[in-house]
Amino acid sequence: MDTITRQDRITLKNLKVADFASEETLCFTATVMFDGRPIAEARNDGHGGSTFVRALQGQAALLAQAEEFVKSLPPASLDVEREDDEPLLIDMTLDFLVDQLADAMHAERKLRTAFNRDIGNKVLFIKDGRLLFLKGIKLKAIADRAAYFAKLRSRQDQPIVILAELPADEAFAIWKQHVLGDKPR
């Protein structure tokens, strides 16, 4: 999951997004975690306003610690067009970080959904550095995948990588790299 700011102490759990209600900003609710402990509930109504972060009962001190931690992070540099070619820097706040995390988690979920749809319905493979699939062949309909994949390999003049044979996370990373045009990290 990519965000503008790299840190691992503050995360979100139980993210619920209402795409239909998202207008200017992402409409969501989530539990804010600090060092693995739930400390607050966050919500944004999706109308362009702020994200509200409210401490859970008895967690106000931890919420204050989390806010101090976020203030210690370097400012976020946004990629926006400016006349002076200077990067736009925004001081980190907890609500801004929560927005980043929610956006990144939601985008990752949507990507995972598209991947799961593709990997379940298509025979996806990498050949010559390109992501390809067999038209009209549904992966779910192949009874003996090992034999089918062996035959597919024998018909190729170059080695191929069949995504269905890889562990799910590895297949997702390769698929994502090709679909989004990302370079491997």
Model-derived features: positions:
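Terminal leader/tail segments of proteins
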Residues: 1-34, 38-185
